[in-house]
Amino acid sequence: LKTDVTKAADVKALVDKAVSSFGKIDVLINNAGLMAIAPLSETKVEEWDKMIDINIKGVLYGIAAVLPIFQNQSSGHIINLSSVAGIKVFSPGGTVYSGTKYAVRAITEGLRHEVGGAIRTTSIEPGAIDSELKHGSSHEESSAHVKEFYKQAIPSDSIARAIAYAIEQPDDVDVNEIVIRPTVQEF
């Protein structure tokens, strides 16, 4: 089912389809993201809007779609993909991206406080992972910097294993955060 995470109705339709197909939903992984890196002085306002729409609103729309279901079934697990840039500002050029990823961490932690107990929350903070994320910038100099940075990337299945680890824990164990990056990555 094609889903645009910037549209709450699309995300709700995806969740509804999962419930109608499988009878329930156990886990939501908010994984969509955009990393449009450029110095603030470049005023890439349209890219800022897209990052906010995808990286923050997309997470909120996912939560809004599953939370009533999880509360009704007294179980569920929401996993949000943040970034190491949500722990330390990625600069130069990553100020807005980092802001969106700090927001994802805050939303995940706030959600844990609000609905903890039967509903688990996990924030995954990836470093350089081999994915399409590195292609999000229209700023040439920043894009070259990002491509150089991603030469150290580890395979995306590293993230899949981290997510599986969080999901596979007993119901009374909540893995709140996982930071995962290449061993050679300093940032």
Give the role of each language-model region.
Residues 43, 89-98, 110:
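Active-site loop-to-helix junction immediately N-terminal to the catalytic Tyr of the SDR YXXXK motif
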